Swiss-Prot record:
It comes from Mycolicibacterium gilvum (strain PYR-GCK). This is tRNA N6-adenosine threonylcarbamoyltransferase. It catalyses: L-threonylcarbamoyladenylate + adenosine(37) in tRNA = N(6)-L-threonylcarbamoyladenosine(37) in tRNA + AMP + H(+). It is found in: Cytoplasm. The lineage of its organism: Bacteria, Bacillati, Actinomycetota, Actinomycetes, Mycobacteriales. Required for the formation of a threonylcarbamoyl group on adenosine at position 37 (t(6)A37) in tRNAs that read codons beginning with adenine. Is involved in the transfer of the threonylcarbamoyl moiety of threonylcarbamoyl-AMP (TC-AMP) to the N6 group of A37, together with TsaE and TsaB. TsaD likely plays a direct catalytic role in this reaction. Belongs to the KAE1 / TsaD family. Its cofactor is Fe(2+). PROSITE patterns: GLYCOPROTEASE (PS01016). Fe cation binds at H113, H117, D302. HAMAP family: TsaD. The gene is tsaD. CDD domains: ASKHA_NBD_TsaD_bac.
Length: 340
C-alpha cells in the first residue's frame, strides 16, 4: 500500500510517500520539504498568514517532486496533518489532501502531527517497541507512554508553561542570535562551559509533578543574569541554559522509563536535533541499561514522511478512513491519533 501524506502545521510544507508492506513494515519512498523559515526570520517568529500563503505556493511543486522521487503516479491512500498547529496553515494542507483523495478516489486519513514525530523514527531504526516518548518541539513538550504506534498514546506529563523549543527561541533572541535560534544557540553553547553558570531546573522539587515540565522560570533567570552581567560570555550563558534544559528533559524521561519498567526511550520533535540533548540522553540511557532511539536530525523537524509513517501504523492497526468533512483542529491533543 502506497501512502502519500501532507504536512502543513507550521512553516514547513512537507510531502512524504511511504509503502506499508504486508508484514507491517514501513518503507520511505520520498520526503520532500519546502520551508518558509526565511520569510519569518525578519519578524522574529512565525507569522501565520505568511505561513499559509507559503503553503499555497509550495504545495504543488513539492507534491510533484515527491511523486517523481517515489516513481508513483497515484497512491492508495492520502493522509494529512489535521492538528495541532496553526489554523490557516492546517487548512491549506488538509484541503489539498482531501482534494487529492477525491480526485484519485482513494481513502483519506486525518492524523495527529505529534504522533507523526514519534513515527518518524521507524525509518531509521525499524519497528518501535514499547517506549517512553519524549516529544520536544517549538510548541510542545510531552512525556508519553507509547505501547505501540497503532494504539492510543498515554500522556504522562507536559509543560505547564513554555515548551522547550519556545524557550530556545526566546533565549536566542535575547542573545541576539536571530530566528530560528535553536541551531545557532546549540552551536554557540558548544563553545562555552556548561558549568560556568548554573541556571535553575524547573519542576524538579520533591513536591512537583514528576513528569511535568516548566521552562518559564529558566527563561526569566537567564534574562535576569544577562541583564545583571553584561560582561558575561554569551557562549557560557548558552551552555548553561542548554545544560539546564537537557538535564531536566533527560532526567524525567529516564525516571519515567524506570517507573513504568520500559526499556526504550524515544526522543522526537525539532529539539531532538539538539546535540547536548542527544549526548546527555545517550549517557543516561547507557547508565540505566536502556535503549535510546532518536531520528536523524532531518526527520526531527516537520516533514511529510513522518505523517505517512504514522498513517501507515494506524492503517496497519485497523483504523478506518476519516470522512472528507473532518475538520482541522489547531488544539488537537497528543492522545488523539486520528480524526475519524
Amino acid at each position: 500500500m502506497i501512502i502519500l501524506a501532507i504536512e502543513s502545521s507550521c512553516d514547513e510544507t512537507g510531502v512524504g510517500i511511504a509503502e506499508l508492506g504486508d508484514d507491517g513494515s514501513v518503507t520511505l519512498l520520498a520526503d520532500e520539504v519546502a520551508s518558509s523559515v526565511d520569510e519569518h526570520a525578519r519578524f522574529g517568529g512565525v507569522v501565520p498568514e505568511i505561513a499559509s500563503r507559503a503553503h499555497l505556493e509550495a504545495l504543488g511543486p513539492t507534491m510533484r517532486r515527491a511523486l517523481a522521487t517515489a516513481g508513483v503516479d497515484k497512491p492508495d491512500v492520502v493522509a494529512a496533518t489535521i492538528g495541532p498547529g496553526l489554523a490557516g496553515a492546517l487548512l491549506v494542507g488538509v484541503a489539498a489532501a482531501k482534494a487529492y483523495a477525491a480526485a484519485w478516489q482513494v481513502p483519506f486519513y486525518a492524523v495527529n502531527h505529534l504522533g507523526g514525530h514519534l513515527a518518524a523514527d521507524v525509518f531509521d531504526h525499524g519497528p518501535l517497541p514499547e517506549s517512553i516518548g519524549l516529544l520536544v518541539s517549538g510548541g510542545h513538550t510531552h512525556l508519553l507512554h507509547v505501547r505501540s504506534l497503532g494504539e492510543p498514546i498515554i500522556e504522562l506529563g507536559s509543560t505547564v508553561d513554555d515548551a522547550a523549543g519556545e524557550a530556545y527561541d526566546k533565549i536566542a533572541r535575547l542573545l541576539g542570535l536571530g530566528y530560528p535560534g535553536g541551531r545557532v544557540l546549540d552551536e554557540l553553547a558548544r563553545e562555552g562551559d556548561p558549568k560556568a553558570i548554573t541556571f535553575p531546573r524547573g519542576m524538579t522539587g520533591p513536591r512537583d509533578e514528576p513528569y511535568a515540565f516548566s521552562f518559564s522560570g529558566l527563561k526569566t533567570a537567564v534574562a535576569r543574569y544577562v541583564e545583571s552581567h553584561p560582561e558575561a560570555s554569551q557562549a557560557d550563558v548558552a551552555a548553561g541554559f542548554q545544560e539546564a534544559v537537557a538535564d531536566v528533559l533527560t532526567a524525567k524521561a529516564v525516571r519515567a522509563a524506570g517507573d513504568l519498567g520500559v526499556s526504550t526511550l524515544l526522543i522526537a520533535g525539532g529539539v531532538a536535533a539538539n546535540s547536548r540533548l542527544r549526548e546527555l540522553a545517550a549517557q543516561r540511557c547507557e547508565a540505566a541499561g536502556m535503549t535510546l532511539r532518536i531520528p536523524r536530525p532531518r526527520l526531527c523537524t516537520d516533514n511529510g514522511a513522518m505523517i505517512a509513517s504514522f498513517a501507515a501504523h494506524l492503517i496497519a492497526a485497523g483504523a478506518a478512513p476519516s470522512p472528507l468533512d473532518a475538520a482541522s483542529d489547531p488544539g488537537l491533543p497528543v492522545v488523539q491519533g486520528q480524526v475519524a
